[in-house]
Structures are given as structure tokens and as C-alpha cells.
């Protein structure tokens, strides 16, 4: 499969939402480069088998499987700094005043926060 997506709409979404700016080339990543960044920064950290890595990369390039697109978007320096940005949602009980600063931090990372204000938790405040 080429480094490009089959339709203009897919290309627009991938470029506008997931492709990183490449300073040296003065352009955004193409689909193949975006997938490679994801493979190198996320998948290769847990999978060491080159054959499996290549198979996963080809499956993503061929649109046979899709990873978490938030992980695709943040793979690299952002996720290395704090992997909270790779999650779509999180949850915490409001049982300590620190719950509020944790919720704010998680939200600032771009992750949604669900919370519980059940009696057994809020009585601990």
C-alpha cells in the first residue's frame, strides 16, 4: 500500500487531525509516515518481533485494522512526556480534595474524566 489514503476525505482527516508537521521538509506527514511514527513510538515499545511489527504496520496502512486514533495523534514526544494524553477517558472517585487537581490535569491532557460522587466517597472529603 502506498503512503496515501484512498479518498480525499480520508486524506483530509488524517492530515488535519493526525499528521505531524515536519520542520525539515516543511510539510505534514503523509499517512505512511504517521503510521510509522505510531509503530515506532507505541507498538515497538511492547512488540519486539520484526515480522509482527511489519504485519501490524501493513494492516494499518491497508486500513484492515485501526489503532486508537488518540494514540496515533499523540505518539511521540507528547506521549513520552505523559501518556495520559493517549487515553480517551478516565474515571476517579471524588474521595479526596486532590481528586479535583487530578481531574484538571487529566482534562488538560485532553482526556475525558468521569467521576463518582457517591456517599461512600464524598464523606471522605
What is each model feature region?
Residues 1-125:
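Extended catalytic cores of very large enzyme megasubunits
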